[in-house]
Amino acid sequence: MSDIALTVSVLALVAVVGLWIGNIKVRGVGFGIGGVLFGGIIVGHFVDQAGVTLSGDMLHFIQEFGLILFVYTIGIQVGPGFFASLRVSGLRLNLFAVLIVIMGGLVTAILHKIFAIPLPVVLGIFSGAVTNTPALGAGQQILRDLGTPVDLVDQMGMSYAMAYPFGICGILLTMWLMRLIFRVNVEAEAQKHESSLANGHSLIQTMNIRVENPNLNNMAIQDVPILNSDKIICSRLKRDDTLMVPSPGTIIQAGDLLHLVGQSTDLHNAQLVIGKEVDTSLSTRGTDLRVERVVVTNEKVLGKRIRDLHFKERYDVVISRLNRAGVELVASSDASLQFGDILNLVGRPASIDAVANVVGNAQQKLQQVQMLPVFIGIGLGVLLGSIPLFVPGFPVALKLGLAGGPLIMALILGRIGSIGKLYWFMPPSANLALRELGIVLFLAVVGLKSGGDFVDTLTQGEGLSWIGYGIFITAIPLITIGLLARIFAKMNYLTLCGMLAGSMTDPPALAFANNLHATSGAAALSYATVYPLVMFLRIITPQLLAVIFWGMG
């Protein structure tokens, strides 16, 4: 059998064994995709014992390409929500998550200096303790750039494997500890979260208002400042028994009922100006109007602003809402359309069908992947990661590397959405498949390289010490910031659990947090809020630590 065929066969065996290990769960918690690392260690041990030689160049390529695929697809997935998560609404959650990352780095630095832990080993422990595989890849990349011998770089994977199990267990224990210390009633916390959402300013809501302000009588909608802003959409107007789709030039009369869409604060301000909120239904049922959701798939409208498409003037159709990457937005006239945007349309059936044809509404396109943008994005990401950043006092130039470059490029492209006929939208199923393939390839190679010496290191070497260091790196930041967030910020327990899981970019921990309450989405929401920024910081942190420690000698 050729070296290539043998290497591929062994990698396939690693994937099978590792995924089987990952599917083993104890009380609903397992290693998940991280099981591939341990599958690689097991197979690698026996490969080493048998004296089998695999293709080193091929393993290196597969490891790096797997990492690139993984971080790129993560960036495309979270890109649309990354910059939004940095805004005020998620500022507090991101602040606490960033503190966890910083404190983890500080604990790592202290352990490195006090116990003189070799740099590759301590970076591996850090990556495993925070259960972040891209951090492992980024650390190995910067160590190679610094000229670290290959056998020492491979120690990073071994120490990562030592610290990884408690990294997963530690966050679950922290959630349990917070619940015990503060005697949390999960049902009450879920109800508080739902109440806060209902009273919050971030959700898109609706309000029906009767026009009672005499100053607005016989005025056009476009002449009423509160209705002519991009903060509120007037999607329906009912006069007597007639329901219509209003245009900017529609004349308002006393007694008209307006159906407004916007954030709660803006709706309240509009109600103070216009008149009184009423419970009267403005449903399209039984009328010649209907409400329908269509998806943007036509390349010709990508990047165009809603106002430039003139849907109201041409088709008498109003866009009441815009859903982008799962986030409901007010369909302001300045909003540019991106591939995969979901538009909420109000109008007559024939008119809605006409608008649907303009924007595409081809559901099958959502299941197709444009491969050209994928490779353009990966290529640009690799180029970005290769740009040297010279910092005074450092022995080598700092680079984003093969982990940071594709991630940042994917975040940017995911946020842009499309350029001309090129769009970076990727169907969730395709994104997940590429992401899982990438991480399986990466972890399989890391495990294979670590397997030969793993048992000896654990039983005769410093393996137990590495596990102890990992416990400190995992537990100290989580417990400290968890207590601060609960005591001083009065953070909701379910939100706190999601934030802790997000700060470790740990899907098993998110699954555990979601299972705390069957119907509440609090944990998932906070996880998604902090995940993009934390993932970026987790990849950058080991590179910064490596360069700083290397410079300090």
Swiss-Prot record:
Residues 192-276, 279-361 form the RCK C-terminal domain. One of its GO terms (cellular component) is plasma membrane. PROSITE patterns: RCK_C. InterPro entries: AAE_transporter, RCK_C, RCK_C_sf, Transpt_YidE_put, YidE_YbjL. Keywords: Cell membrane, Membrane, Repeat, Transmembrane, Transmembrane helix, Transport. It is found in: Cell membrane. It comes from the Bacteria. GO terms for biological process: potassium ion transport. GO terms for molecular function: monoatomic cation transmembrane transporter activity. The chain crosses the membrane at residues 4-24, 28-48, 65-85, 95-115, 158-178, 371-391, 393-413, 437-457, 464-484, 493-513, 533-553. Pfam families: Asp-Al_Ex, TrkA_C. It is a multi-pass membrane protein. Belongs to the AAE transporter (TC 2.A.81) family. YidE subfamily. PANTHER family: K(+)_H(+) ANTIPORTER SUBUNIT KHTT, TRANSPORT PROTEIN YIDE-RELATED. This is Putative transport protein YidE. It comes from Salmonella paratyphi C (strain RKS4594).
